[in-house]
């Protein structure tokens, strides 16, 4: 019996990516593995269908859990709110509930200075990170309220420490950190835990 038996977890950016030695190199997949070890039903999202299919196959074979993958590209210039709603609707249709939301996915142009950053590069980080997190939280809220669930949002040390060449990434992550604090205040009375993780890498 695991801590998350029959619970449903959505993990953005949860596809499998292999390192040169064949081991898993995706943070999202590592998170999915941790929840699968505890018996959770897993929903992984991302842009690359091959990586998502590989994640599903490995999680189901290695841990005996059920896994659903949903392709979801939340880049700028698209109807990202509808894309996110598609993921949430698919998760509820498959598993009947949402107990944990992990907002892990984020794309950005690394190593570009403030002076040289383009609007498109800035939009890439803001849409894939800040807006996506906002839309997922909104879409999952009624289900998390019902399940007394949890949200885990990924921010970053890049914003906390002003990492060189990380302006858009840092801005998006600091937005996520602030939004998480507000949501924790607003959603606490509903029994929803909202936490933010700030990796240093």
Across the structure, where does each feature detected by a protein language model lie?
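Canonical Rossmann dinucleotide-binding motif of NAD(H)/NADP(H)-dependent dehydrogenases/reductases
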Residues: 2-41
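Active-site loop immediately N-terminal to the catalytic Tyr-X3-Lys motif
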Residues: 21, 115, 148, 161-167, ...
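Rossmann-fold cofactor-recognition segment
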Residues: 63-79
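Substrate-binding pocket helix/loop in short-chain dehydrogenase/reductase
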Residues: 112-114, 118-123
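Active-site helix of classical SDR
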Residues: 137, 172, 180
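Alpha-helical segment proximal to the catalytic Tyr-Lys
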Residues: 142, 185-189
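Residue(s) in the substrate-gating loop at a strand-loop-helix junction
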Residues: 156
């Amino acid at each position: 019996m695991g801590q998350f038996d029959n619970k449903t977890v959505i993990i953005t950016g949860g596809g499998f990516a292999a390192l040169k030695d064949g081991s898993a190199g995706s943070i999202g997949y590592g998170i999915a593995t941790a929840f699968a070890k505890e018996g959770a039903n897993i929903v992984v999202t991302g842009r690359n269908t091959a990586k998502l299919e590989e994640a599903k196959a490995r999680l189901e074979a290695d841990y005996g859990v059920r896994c659903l993958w949903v392709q979801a590209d939340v880049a700028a210039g698209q109807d990202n709110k509808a894309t996110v709603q598609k993921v949430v609707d698919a998760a509820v249709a498959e598993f009947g509930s949402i107990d944990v939301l992990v907002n892990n996915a984020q794309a950005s142009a690394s190593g570009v200075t403030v002076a040289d950053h383009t609007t498109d590069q800035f939009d890439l980080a803001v849409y894939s990170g800040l807006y996506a997190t906002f839309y997922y939280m909104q879409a999952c809220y009624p289900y998390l309220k019902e399940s007394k669930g949890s949200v885990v949002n990924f921010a970053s040390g890049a914003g906390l420490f002003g990492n060189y060449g990380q302006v858009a990434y840092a801005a998006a992550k600091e937005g996520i950190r602030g939004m998480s604090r507000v949501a924790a205040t607003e959603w606490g009375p509903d029994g929803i835990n909202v936490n933010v993780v700030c990796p240093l890498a």
